Amino acid sequence: MGKSVAILGAQWGDEGKGKIVDLLTDRVKYVVRYQGGHNAGHTLIINGEKTVLRLIPSGILRENVTCLIGNGVVLSPAALMQEMGELESRGINVRDRLKISEACPLILPYHVAMDHAREAALGKNKIGTTGRGIGPAYEDKVSRRGLRVSDLFNREAFAEKLKTILEYYNFQLVHYYKVEPVDYQKTLDDVFAVADIITGMVADITTLLHKARANGDNILFEGAQGTMLDIDHGTYPFVTSSNTTAGGIATGSGFGPRNLDYVLGIIKAYCTRVGSGPFTTELFDEVGAEIARKGNEFGAVTGRPRRCGWFDAVAVRRAIQINSISGFCMTKLDVLDGFEELKICVAYKLQNGEIVEYSPLAAANWEGVEPIYETLPGWKENTFRVTKLEDLPQNAINYIKRIEEVLGVPVDILSTGPDRVETMILRDPFAA
């Protein structure tokens, strides 16, 4: 019987999901993206060669794996073509191994223009989006006016729909935001230039997945961003526009929740966040700067510096609840080498004095929240590229064990470097 495993971020994204997806894809036949778009960069380092994937599932680097893009993903034709070109220039066969749901909403230039215009208008109150049109594309989906991959099969109808949608967008862009309109003919020509390539990869993703399960094939679901950025369960409104949690798998691919065997939550040994929004354990001192420097904490897609802080067990407990997490993979343990002491946030003190062990949902309720820390001794020894648990410093082992105790969920995989070989699999999700 095949196993279906989900890999998703249990913090604010950038936890190192891409590496772990790539690591485990030698066990699977299918890797599935089910939400988000090209706003999340998954960085893979294999034999020293760096690859950043934004839209195509990380399994594309394994030649026997078929990659699926489910209906929950918003698809930018321009981003897809760019990424395909980069991979194909390296001899990687993409077109025969990538399948796309015809129900994927399309991201087009007017979505990007609206994203930029809104962020500029918000000024210091901006959400901190990547500016790639993700939010506006999801808005079109919910309002039922969006163009989808299926519309590419009827070009005449597509052209008419595009005309109507652009009238709506350009009116706002010109008259409210005072920016240039998006050109209809160029948008149409650019989409039609690549339409045949995209439609040639269309498949019934839901049926394909259920047949794979019936055949006993292993399936891996690749989440983007992180739990605390979920549109419903994250620090709203400082969130992304999709369901980044395990529930998004069912809605974003048509693969029912009872079919999921294991949920692997990815956590850094500390915490980071990109953009605006609450971050209780954020460090503003030299320790935070040192973590950022050692961890090379800059966004894979945007290049923006990430905010850094101590490990927040309160936020991760919320992620455990929402996702039914089976086990964790802890990444970047080596970044904590050399610190005299380390801290774990085990509870929050709210503004009214109440002590809570689970994070608030709305961003407004994080106002004035204070972290309650446990302090543990650090270690001077090197953990970088260590691949046996017994070879780790005792204080590093103690740190991991304390996090397991605080969370009540085991660390099943440990990453001590960026390359796929710099990993300890303590319990294999596909064998669990």
From Swiss-Prot:
Key word Nucleotide-binding present: yes
Protein known as: Adenylosuccinate synthetase
Gene Ontology BP annotations: 'de novo' AMP biosynthetic process; IMP metabolic process
InterPro entries: Adenylosuccin_syn_GTP-bd, Adenylosuccin_syn_Lys_AS, Adenylosuccinate_synth_dom1, Adenylosuccinate_synth_dom2, Adenylosuccinate_synth_dom3, Adenylosuccinate_synthetase, P-loop_NTPase
Similarity-based family: Belongs to the adenylosuccinate synthetase family.
Catalytically driven reaction(s): IMP + L-aspartate + GTP = N(6)-(1,2-dicarboxyethyl)-AMP + GDP + phosphate + 2 H(+)
Binding-site list for Mg(2+): 14, 41
UniProt remark on cofactor binding: Binds 1 Mg(2+) ion per subunit.
Function noted in UniProt: Plays an important role in the de novo pathway of purine nucleotide biosynthesis. Catalyzes the first committed step in the biosynthesis of AMP from IMP.
Gene Ontology annotations for the cellular component aspect, listed alphabetically: cytoplasm
Active site as annotated: 14, 42
GO MF annotation terms: adenylosuccinate synthase activity; GTP binding; magnesium ion binding
Enzyme Commission no: 6.3.4.4
Predominant location category: cytoplasm
Keyword terms, alphabetized: Cytoplasm, GTP-binding, Ligase, Magnesium, Metal-binding, Nucleotide-binding, Purine biosynthesis
Listed pathway(s): Purine metabolism; AMP biosynthesis via de novo pathway; AMP from IMP: step 1/2
Broad class of enzyme this protein falls into: ligase
Cellular location(s): Cytoplasm
One Pfam family it belongs to: Adenylsucc_synt
